[in-house]
Amino acid sequence: MIRFTLALAVIGVTFAASTPQIETNPNLEIIGGHDANIIDYPWQISFQHRLHHFCGGFLISDTWVVTAAHCIYEGYSDTENLNIRVGSSEWSAKGKLHDVKRYITHPQYNITTMDNDIALLELALPVDLNQSVRPAKLPVAGQEIPDNAQLTITGWGATYVGGYNEYTLQVVTIPTVNINVCQSAITNDTITNNMFCAGLIGVGGKDSCSGDSGGPAVIDGQVVGIVSWGYSCADPKYPGIYTKVSAFRDWINEETEI
């Protein structure tokens, strides 16, 4: 069963799609990380519905944000109740809130296979750029993800099983996993060319999950991935799956001219 998480501050929502079932779950979290300072990750944003954090994302300009397509679904797609917080290590305070003007989900996003799990948010007003608010550096189109590279993930997911979102930004670093090794672990679903994997296979204990969906995954200062889906969190048997940003570089440019 595929599991991904849209973590709300105080509630969880479950819905089913066709096989495999896709389930939100408030008990999955970033594990094995530590507190982070937004100055070190100034592209990170908190994607919020009615002022409650439920997904991550990252700035690519002063008016555009990238997140996961699965973060935008029925019940959480009403733009009048969507906003982002920038420039703060805390999702609930400081920095500045910005309204979402519109969103664009990838036209080929598949909720069953989780392929093309990417979306864009256009902000109503531009953010003020400073040391805590800065667009991410993106890879070039077609850039591949090396095996065993150190992937850094940030987000506000809970820090223990069954917990709520963490109020302070968390960071964790895990290695990328060879695509064939990953596919041998993820036996019931396909790892497409638009995805890559990361995790401590055989060890576990560190991972991204709830509240981190849509957030940035960074290698050498570039945001190369988007937190997308997985069978579990921090499980030594299963790596996490990330949307490969370089596979969508042309689409991002077509929609945003960035």
From Swiss-Prot:
Signal peptide: 1-16
GO biological process: digestion; proteolysis
Record-annotated site: Required for specificity: D207
InterPro entries reported for this sequence: Peptidase_S1, Peptidase_S1_PA, Peptidase_S1_PA_chymotrypsin, Peptidase_S1A, Trypsin_dom, TRYPSIN_HIS
One GO CC annotation: extracellular region
Tissue: Expressed in larval carcasses and gut, and adult gut.
Top EC class of this enzyme: hydrolase
Catalytic activity: Preferential cleavage: Arg-|-Xaa, Lys-|-Xaa
Glycosylation (residues): N110, N130, N188
Enzyme Commission (EC) number: 3.4.21.4
Superkingdom to which the source organism belongs: Eukaryota
GO MF term list: serine-type endopeptidase activity
Peptidase S1 domain mapped to chain residues: 30-257
Subcellular localization(s) per the UniProt record: Secreted
Alphabetically ordered keywords of this record: Digestion, Disulfide bond, Glycoprotein, Hydrolase, Protease, Secreted, Serine protease, Signal, Zymogen
Disulphide connectivity of cysteines: C55-C71, C182-C197, C209-C233
Propeptide positions: 17-29
Active site: H70 (charge relay system), D117 (charge relay system), S213 (charge relay system)
Similarity section: Belongs to the peptidase S1 family.
Name of the protein described by the UniProt record: Trypsin
Organism: Phaedon cochleariae
